[in-house]
Design a protein with these regions (language model features):
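Aromatic-enriched alpha-helical interface/lid elements that frame and gate functional surfaces
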Residues: 246-323, 327
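A short glycine-threonine-serine/GTX helix/turn-capping micro-motif
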Residues: 170-181, 203-205, 236-247, 258-261, ...
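Terminal low-complexity tails and localization/encapsulation signals of metabolic enzymes
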Residues: 1-9, 251-253, 335-409
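Short Gly/Pro-enriched turn/cap motifs at secondary-structure boundaries
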Residues: 58-59, 67, 233-242, 248-249, ...
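Oxidoreductase and adenylate-handling cofactor-binding alpha/beta cores
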Residues: 154, 164, 183-203, 216, ...
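Glycine-rich beta-alpha junction loops
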Residues: 40, 133-135, 210-215, 254-256, ...
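Mid-domain beta-loop-alpha active-site segment that forms a flexible
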Residues: 176-191, 210-218, 264, 268
Length: 409
């Protein structure tokens, strides 16, 4: 299968998920991604055992989806950047890399000698990519954040998703939700920068913020608010079918939900009525044209709700099979992991963990030549230190002295 990033080396000095998930995508695409972890502490995310109330490690195993997801396919080196003895190793890694990838705050980068000027002094042709919470410059450049703050809360999604009058704010639907969207964005930016370097010789600096990704995800509503000159009126998501009965969610007899998104109701209404066993509704004078259907949408939506409530999810799946209009079952995450469409194209990919056990991870959604991805596991902490240093020509007494000094592990 094609590996478009084969031959590209990425040096990643990052923690948690936002920026590391970009490294995972690049590794999926064939890049050699070297993950620099602190020689004693490692990636801080390795210390997490629970997230959103869920265990994030497999008990009695080295497999940890919270690490293997955003770090699969990489090699790990334990390197204490704050120690002078680590400088030569760092510079050799920079010198032999095409991309430098980080989410450290500017003040930390300056302290560790990994700011843009520091890195470019060693390798002028390197792509420098930095992920931030709010902005790469300005008064908030040194302000840290996570996707829950920068992407979800400040980026507009949280307010938009929360119904009017709600007692509690709607939280992100999953851990690292904004981080993973942001990671794909970073990977795309790096790919474009590498393409530009190939054509022009210019090594670009790539900056992406979680706030910017959040604003982009919410861009339609943000743009509409800017056009209106005021915040958009809030509406209850349950009222999504106020002007079109074929949009919105409807509950089935067994407590599941169907999502209908048929944006051309006049086109899809007749077949829908046939499929639900109520063909007479298509000829009903209240609903027999697109204009009438939209004018009487509340009444039609009430009828649709009663109809959908009369059968189970599985019965509706069978009834709607092959229907032209757009609809979907609302799935939980376990069902997503077993979704037949995703399984068919290999996006729920097998990976063998460090104990030899076959696991499954979600692959990134980009496929080349319609071939399923082949994933490899994430690295154990500092698993490849000796291997990487050997490639740099650091062996024997020099390697031993670095370990004694605590510069590497």
């Amino acid at each position: 299968m094609i590996k478009p990033m084969e031959g590209i080396r990425v040096l990643e000095v990052a923690q948690f998920t936002f920026v590391p998930s970009a490294g995972a995508v690049l590794a999926d695409w064939g890049a050699d991604v070297i993950k620099v972890e602190h020689a004693e502490k490692g990636d801080a995310q390795r210390g997490l055992v629970k997230a959103l109330g869920h265990d994030v490690v497999s008990k009695g195993s080295s497999f940890a989806p919270i690490m293997d997801g955003p770090n699969r396919g990489k090699r790990s080196i334990g390197l204490s950047l704050e120690k002078p003895e680590a400088t030569r190793v760092l510079h050799e890694l920079i010198r032999t890399s095409d991309v430098f990838l980080t989410n450290f705050l500017p003040r930390a980068r300056a302290k560790l000698g990994i700011d843009i000027d520091d890195v470019r002094a060693v390798n002028p042709g390197i792509i420098y990519a930095a992920g931030t919470a709010f902005a790469h410059s300005g008064p908030e450049a040194d302000k840290g954040g996570y996707d829950g703050t920068a992407f979800w809360a400040r980026g507009g999604s949280a307010d938009t998703a929360t119904p009017p009058g709600a007692e509690h704010l709607v939280q992100q639907p999953g851990g690292a939700y904004g981080d993973n969207i942001g990671g794909m964005t970073i990977a795309g930016g790096i790919a474009a920068a590498l393409f530009a370097r190939e054509r022009t010789g210019h090594a670009a600096t790539v900056d992406i913020s979680l706030l910017g990704v959040g604003a982009w995800a919410s861009q339609l509503n943000v743009n509409l608010a800017l056009m209106a000159g005021a915040p958009l009126p809030k509406f209850d998501p349950r009222d999504g079918n106020v002007s079109n009965p074929l949009t919105g969610t409807y509950r089935t007899a067994d407590g599941r939900w169907l999502s209908l998104v048929m944006l051309q109701p006049g086109r899809y209404w007749p077949e829908f009525c046939e499929r639900v066993g109520r063909p007479e509704l298509a000829a009903d004078e209240r609903f027999d044209s697109a204009g009438k259907l939209m004018a009487n949408a509340r009444e039609a939506a009430g009828i649709v709700a009663e109809i959908v409530a009369g059968r189970t999810k599985d019965e509706w799946v069978a009834a709607f099979d092959g229907m032209e209009g757009q609809w979907a079952v609302v799935q939980n995450t376990f069902e997503v992991g077993h979704d037949p469409a995703l399984r068919h194209i290999g996006q729920i990919a097998e990976v063998v963990d460090a104990d030899g056990v076959v696991r499954r991870l979600v692959a990134n959604p980009v496929q080349f030549d319609r071939e399923p991805p082949r994933l490899t596991r994430g690295p154990l902490f500092a698993e490849h230190t000796d291997e990487i240093l050997g490639e740099l020509g650091i062996t024997g007494d020099e390697l031993l002295n670095l370990k004694i000094a605590g510069a590497v592990t």
